Amino acid sequence: MSFRLDSFAPNWGASVMGTSVVAVATAAIGWPVWISRTLLILASLVAVVVVVVTGARWIRHRELALADLRHPIKGGMTATVAGGLLAWAVAIGRIGAGWLPDGLVTGAVAVLTVAGAVLALMIGWAFMTNLFTNQSTPTEHISGAWFIPPVVTIIIPLALVPLALELPDSSADLLALGWGFLGMGAVLYFVVTAVLFLRTVSHPLPPDALAPTLFIGMGPAGLMGLDMVRLAQASGNPGLVDAMTPLATMMWGFGFWWMIASLLVIRRGYGRLPFSLSWWGFVFPFGAWTVATSVLAQTWDSGLFDVMAWIATVLLVALWLMTSINTLAGIRRGTIWAH
């Protein structure tokens, strides 16, 4: 099957999110800078392609794009484009500092953060409004893809932190917005968790192609922990850092539980999964949790967390390589466009 613009899947943004978070993870653990910089360049190339193609599809095939947004499964996946912009912004802010000109880094992070945040809110509101007003969503269409809009919202505070540090006159406003976005995404995450839990225990599991979406739930847990620590650190208030670190660790622990539980469910309920584009749903959630592990290792000054962060980073890079290689092979053979 050859590439067709009208059939370009709405979840390609997950590849940008995944590559960006791997870049951040390798920087957070302290690996040689050329690794994270190379990954940032790759993430930037992928981001440009995905954004341009997605934009072209919205211009030339608007009705198909709107149909995806209204779909109870694809609608959630549409938010990955916004997530890609925000994860890219976080990667530029983390890795670009000290490498690229300060003005370029701040400007790029600001533009991507604003664009990503606006898209995240618009897509999230549109998706949720459609679900509420449709009132006939089949239970089998409830999936882990519903986690994506909350996940994307929770990335926004991490993109705001470097801006708050570089723009001291606006620091209080930016940090306040960060806490607000964290609350927005966190509450939505817990609501979706309850809905997905009820759906999963009372109905058959989603089809194979959606199995990786069950794994997405660990992502927001890691991101919430990261948000708490980073926002507290950016405030310059040691007392707030001390208060947020245990809460962040609690969320990290829930993310670890979710990771093991979802892998057990996938292993027992599905067996061997065929590769599909949805495999990128494994990369970003695990990457977010891995970065949280590295940050908590530094905050707690914990040798145990440091070892876990190293192991998780190695596994993350291996997962990203496997997913990337399979994606490139699918593009070469044309099979990826069927998903």
Residue ranges of predicted features:
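First transmembrane helix
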Residues: S15-V21, S44-G55, I123-A126
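Internal transmembrane alpha-helix with an interfacial aromatic "cap," most often the third helix
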Residues: A91-I95, I123-S136, L158-L167, A186-L205, ...
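Juxtamembrane helix-loop boundaries in multi-pass membrane proteins
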Residues: M1-A25, R62-V90, V109, T113, ...
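C-terminal transmembrane-bundle signature of multipass membrane proteins
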Residues: A23-V24, A47-V53, R57, T193-R199, ...
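Helix-coil boundary and interhelical linker segments in multi-pass alpha-helical membrane proteins
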Residues: A25-I35, G93-A108, L160-L177, V229-D242, ...
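Membrane helical hairpin/interfacial module
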Residues: P32-L104, L112
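Hydrophobic, membrane-facing alpha-helical anchors
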Residues: M1-R4, G55-A67, G103-G107, M122-Q135, ...
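Structural signature of hydrophobic alpha-helical transmembrane segments
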Residues: T38-V52, V105-L121, A176-V191, T245-G255, ...
